[in-house]
């Protein structure tokens, strides 16, 4: 039992929506309001577009692409992100970085950048666009399962959205898709 609860969610307190040209006539839901595949919307048997590749987007994409939900899930990203595991050899990733205080951070970043393809953290390996930044110059996305879902075809990768037209969404690569929910 506690006398007080403090929620320290920092800059993530305010839901931000991208401003795409056109109008989407399907359902829209921000991750800020997402609870699970049944609440606040029934997200089963749907054509779903997840926009963004932060940690919340990755977690929601993985959950909604479960075969049991029978969804078609597409992930669209504007700037992309490096996808790193939450754990390496049973240890949290950030604790491994702290074990190398004598190696300059710039050297650590360069070594990781060179090893990115071998480590499987380069999003281009899974059909996503190249990040617009070097590894660790911006917050990476932490997910073990997202690369598996992208690699298996359970999630379809797409570049940024260019415009909306009813239930049709157009992407930078010239393709389009019809979606029930964004």
Model-derived features: positions:
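Flavin (primarily FAD) cofactor-binding/catalytic cores of flavoenzymes
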Residues: 1-55, 59-81, 86-87, 101-182
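Short secondary-structure boundary/capping segments
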Residues: 89-93
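Basic, ligand-binding patches in group-transfer machinery
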Residues: 97-98
């Amino acid at each position: 039992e506690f006398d007080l609860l403090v929620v320290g969610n920092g800059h993530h307190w305010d839901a931000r929506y991208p401003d795409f040209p056109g109008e989407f006539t399907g359902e829209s839901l921000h991750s800020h309001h997402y609870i699970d595949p049944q609440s606040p919307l029934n997200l089963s048997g749907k054509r779903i577009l997840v926009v963004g590749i932060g940690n919340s987007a990755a977690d929601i994409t993985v959950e909604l692409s479960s075969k049991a939900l029978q969804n078609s899930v597409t992930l669209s990203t504007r700037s992309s992100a490096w996808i790193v595991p939450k754990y390496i050899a049973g240890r949290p990733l950030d604790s491994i970085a702290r074990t190398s205080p004598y190696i300059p951070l710039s050297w650590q970043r360069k070594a990781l950048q060179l090893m990115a393809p071998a480590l499987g953290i380069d999003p281009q390996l899974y059909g996503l666009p190249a990040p617009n930044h070097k590894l660790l110059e911006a917050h990476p996305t932490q997910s073990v399962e997202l690369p598996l879902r992208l690699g298996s075809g359970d999630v379809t990768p797409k570049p940024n959205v260019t415009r909306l037209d009813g239930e049709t969404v157009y992407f930078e690569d010239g393709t389009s898709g019809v979606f029930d929910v964004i």
